[in-house]
Amino acid sequence: MEAARRPRLGLSRRRPRPAGGPSGGRPWFLLGGDERERLWAELLRTVSPELILDHEVPSLPAFPGQEPRCGPEPTEVFTVGPKTFSWTPFPPDLWGPGRSYRLLHGAGGHLESPARSLPQRPAPDPCRAPRVEQQPSVEGAAALRSCPMCQKEFAPRLTQLDVDSHLAQCLAESTEDVTW
């Protein structure tokens, strides 16, 4: 009887928020210059409330669509046996650890300009193809000289990936517990 008195709960669809406010519901990267800078300053204040933005606000990081574009990457051709393959290399990593923006300096929350915080070195050319680097061979005291499961000797020219691959294969085929 008590269940009959309770109202039934039901699910209802969420109504979209009305497109109000200064931005009109447009994404930040499509806004005009002044409004975009105001939102950027507001974001910086939100991240660090003790921040004082009386002076110039650090420049806004470039949106991926605003970065300079270059033509199609040149294809590299290589031959394996009788077949010839073409390959387009990946572009270089433009946002690696040396390219990050450091806007806040220390615990005090003082702003730094991204240009002052980055080391002074030439920016990488986004149109330049990356160099293929050889992986160093396994050397040193920590390197295994042979497989602990099958006792196969590892050649000194093998890379760490080759050694790890062999160890994984041996471990997968093994039915014994191995203590390292």
Curated annotation (Swiss-Prot):
GO molecular function: K63-linked polyubiquitin modification-dependent protein binding; polyubiquitin modification-dependent protein binding; ubiquitin binding; ubiquitin-modified protein reader activity; zinc ion binding
UniProt main location, coarse: nucleus
Binding site for Zn(2+): C147, C150, H166, C170
Region annotation Disordered: where it falls in the sequence: 1-28, 106-135
Keyword terms of this UniProt record: Chromosome, DNA damage, DNA repair, Metal-binding, Nucleus, Phosphoprotein, Zinc, Zinc-finger
One term under GO cellular component: nucleoplasm
Official protein name in the record: Fanconi anemia core complex-associated protein 20
